[in-house]
Amino acid sequence: MSQKRQTKFQNGKSKTSENSSAKREKGMVVSGKEIYDAVGRSKFVLENLRHYTVHPNLAQYYKPLKATALQKFLAQNRKTTSFMLKVTEYDQDKTLLIMTNNPPPCSITHQDKESAPKYFSKDLLLKVMESHHQHKPTEDLWLPRMPQKKKLRSKLKPIFPLTLSDDPTSKREQWFRFSTDNDFKSEGKYSKVYALRMQKKTYPQLTFAPVHERASKKSASERPISKVIREPLTLASLLEEMPTRTAPGESAFRNGRAPQWIIKKATVIG
């Protein structure tokens, strides 16, 4: 029995080795340079397949995404917060150092007598100590109440006298009254203002002369004409106001001419 089992096992091994070799022969074997097939060279296999088997480095072709506005804002906010935190820590350390080297004076405990006069005068310290000793806990610390003034009447609301029918002698005041006929004697200007508004809307480029110019024109036209008889302007009246002055010249046109010196003979000395 043992011999039969050994022969079967050997036969099985030989069969498996044959099958594996046959599979290898049928399959594709990739060497370093060429590709072989059991039947022969396949026409469907690329010649430069070895160049495509290695994955290329795509990092050089990668374009990073641009940061959004929110990401930029958050990054700037983080930087600002970290900077403020560092400044605060530095200020705390600086303040602690200053307070350690220069402690402020205490008016209650006079342990540090040398530093007290640097900050406060002696008179002020004496006043503080006196007020501290004179203070009583039962003393009322509340300030006195201010006297309540009467409510002031607004200037926009006039006060009208009021007389009662039962008691005509009593005098009262109120902020309103009934309108009378005398209130409606003034000229109404609503229609004029409305007409001006409509004119401005229809003609926006229209310019109006200022009020003072129109008033000056009206006043100039309304000036009274004087009835005084005036004499005509003559040469004699002008000579009375501005008398003539003698000046060098010829005939009657000598007035106003600039003086001239005519040289008849001139000798040049060389």
From Swiss-Prot:
Protein name: Testis-specific gene 13 protein
PANTHER family, A to Z: TESTIS-SPECIFIC GENE 13 PROTEIN
Chain intervals with Polar residues compositional bias: 1-20
Disulfide bridge map: none
InterPro entries associated with the record: TSGA13 (IPR029241)
Region named Disordered: 1-27
Coiled-coil regions listed: none
Phylogenetic placement of the source organism: Eukaryota, Metazoa, Chordata, Craniata, Vertebrata
Originating species: Macaca fascicularis
